């Protein structure tokens, strides 16, 4: 069977199953088995599928994923959103549209702590939206700022997205990926702040000012324990004191101590957090397991090489190739959640990127940046739907306000793609590459 037909069968079966509402993990396994039937015997298929699914989740570094999820869920229920909003207001309180600016800065901080864009949009939006409404903000303007900035936490570490990518990319250094995500994540946040500022100026919005109901020292003191988590975890991982997995364990312990100090979670609530974390972890780990089988089938069938040859037959200009990759990944992000997208398409596009001189680190940042944009676009944009629900606005109302953010973020994505120093500069400065 030709590689072209094999590729069509794989993605056609996968697409049909998704359209029918079959869970994505099952869709991945079934489409992989159907495709493998063209070249392997049934005994080989069952043995290899189980072997690859098992080996796909054997990596010790993957243990960091459920631990970071647990730490993030504890933080989400720990009442830190308000503390971070007050802290952010210290820096942006005198800027027009200051509450939107605080929302963006808060999302950058909260997303880095929780590692979840949906959690950031929900927590920060739920905290700031009522205050913005009291100050006469346009709900669509507020929701757009919240939605556009929430995915920054997928780039600013610690984030499980980089851990998943590291596993599927052949063990790329997690600490290097973490450092590589900082500048692009901050750039993403700055783009959102610039767009929010321009929108506020056009609407004639005034600065809300700094909340003086408590002292600056008290505001910093309240936020410091939460912010210290980033320093401890990232500092420990980068300095080699502990691995990413051990750092995730430290994060869980630290978050538990904070929740006890703040008295924000009771025993019943903690059991609920454990259950929710277990469910989320199970979904992600099964996705990783299933995608390992698909990756083998694609590699065995020569699909990545065929796609690579197809792209390179169009042009040998690396700038055009990178642009085409971005367009494809951006469309993929609109229709697929970040974890399965990383697992399925990294084996396809990473070899192409490296053959044109892009490092595994820069490609990982570019890939996840694309998925961040997919998070805020329909039809599968989870952050878009959560943000609209929190802001009590329809998708139609917020779309016109989101377009300037999307344009600015696409420009930032292109900068990350074509300026390697944006993702490689900090790791290089720290001696990680």
Q: Model-flagged regions — what are they?
A:
Residues 1-433:
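Alpha-helical transmembrane segments of multi-pass membrane transport proteins
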């Amino acid at each position: 069977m030709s590689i072209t037909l094999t590729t069509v069968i794989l993605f056609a079966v996968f697409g049909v199953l998704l359209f029918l509402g079959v869970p994505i993990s099952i869709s991945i396994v079934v489409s992989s088995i159907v495709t493998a039937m063209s070249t392997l015997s049934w005994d080989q298929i069952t043995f290899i599928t189980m072997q690859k699914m098992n080996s796909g989740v054997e990596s010790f570094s993957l243990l960091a994923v459920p631990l970071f999820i647990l730490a993030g869920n504890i933080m989400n229920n720990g009442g830190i959103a308000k503390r971070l909003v007050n802290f952010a207001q210290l820096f942006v309180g005198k800027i027009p549209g200051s509450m939107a600016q605080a929302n963006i800065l808060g999302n950058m901080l909260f997303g880095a702590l929780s590692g979840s864009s949906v959690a950031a949009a929900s927590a920060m939006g739920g905290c700031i939206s009522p205050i913005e409404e009291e100050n006469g903000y346009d709900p669509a303007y507020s929701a757009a700022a919240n939605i556009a900035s929430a995915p920054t936490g997928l780039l600013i570490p610690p984030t499980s997205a980089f851990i998943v990518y590291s596993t599927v990319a052949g063990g790329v250094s997690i600490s290097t990926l973490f450092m590589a995500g900082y500048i692009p994540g901050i750039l993403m946040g700055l783009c959102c702040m610039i767009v929010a500022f321009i929108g506020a100026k056009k609407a004639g919005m005034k600065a809300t000012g700094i909340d003086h109901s408590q002292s600056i020292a008290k505001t910093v003191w309240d936020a410091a324990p939460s912010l210290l988590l980033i320093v401890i975890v990232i500092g420990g991982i980068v300095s080699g004191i502990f691995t990413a997995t051990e750092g995730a364990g430290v994060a869980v312990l630290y978050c538990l101590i904070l929740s006890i100090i703040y008295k924000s979670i009771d025993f019943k609530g903690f059991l609920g957090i454990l259950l929710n974390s277990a469910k989320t972890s199970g979904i992600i780990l099964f996705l990783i397991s299933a995608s390992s089988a698909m990756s083998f089938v694609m590699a065995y069938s020569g699909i990545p090489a065929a796609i690579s040859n197809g792209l390179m037959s169009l042009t040998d200009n690396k700038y055009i190739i990178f642009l085409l990759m971005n367009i494809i990944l951006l469309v993929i992000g609109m229709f697929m959640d970040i974890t399965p997208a990383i697992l399925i398409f990294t084996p396809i596009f990473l070899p192409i990127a490296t053959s044109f001189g892009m490092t595994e680190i820069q490609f990982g940042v570019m890939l996840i940046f694309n998925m961040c944009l997919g998070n805020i676009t329909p039809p599968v944009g989870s952050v878009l739907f959560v943000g609209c629900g929190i802001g009590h606005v329809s998708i139609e109302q917020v779309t016109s306000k989101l377009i300037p953010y999307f344009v600015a973020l696409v420009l930032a994505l292109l900068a990350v793609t074509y300026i390697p120093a944006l993702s490689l500069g900090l790791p290089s400065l720290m001696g990680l590459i």
